[in-house]
């Protein structure tokens, strides 16, 4: 990392790193519940937010604005990941054995 990066560059780096984390996830047995995955993603967002909070600089208002933008981006990426995971879980559900009514 460069000795001095703008907050915009820091946010961009953090988002790229978070995307790498999400892309590395392998959905495999044993599967975890959707509720547990929500907790995991929430924890990841908090981890990245707390780490990057120490790196932003400038006036407090500028720092707050940068962190708000960063957290919103991470939450959006996390929501997209959870939607993909939800779809994956549904694809693993056994087919329903109900017969169509005649």
Curated annotation (Swiss-Prot):
Main location: cytoplasm
Induction trigger: By GATA-1 during erythroid maturation.
Localization per Swiss-Prot or TrEMBL: Cytoplasm
UniProt entry keywords in alphabetical sequence: Chaperone, Cytoplasm
Tissues of expression: Expressed in spleen, bone marrow, and blood, with highest levels in bone marrow.
UniProt entry tagged with the keyword Signal: no
Name of one Pfam family that matches: AHSP
Gene Ontology terms: cellular component: cytoplasm
GO biological process entries: erythrocyte differentiation; protein folding; protein stabilization
Record function comment: Acts as a chaperone to prevent the harmful aggregation of alpha-hemoglobin during normal erythroid cell development. Specifically protects free alpha-hemoglobin from precipitation.
Record-linked PANTHER family: ALPHA-HEMOGLOBIN-STABILIZING PROTEIN
UniProt name for this protein: Alpha-hemoglobin-stabilizing protein
């Amino acid at each position: 990392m460069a000795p001095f990066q703008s907050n915009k560059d820091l946010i961009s780096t953090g988002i790229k790193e978070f995307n790498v984390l999400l892309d590395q996830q392998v959905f495999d047995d044993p599967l975890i519940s959707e509720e547990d995955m929500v907790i995991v993603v929430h924890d990841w967002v908090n981890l990245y937010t707390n780490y990057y909070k120490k790196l932003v600089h400038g006036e407090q208002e500028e720092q707050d604005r940068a962190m708000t933008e960063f957290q919103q981006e991470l939450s959006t990426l996390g929501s997209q990941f959870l939607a993909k995971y939800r779809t994956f879980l549904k694809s693993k559900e056994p087919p329903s054995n109900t017969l169509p009514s005649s």
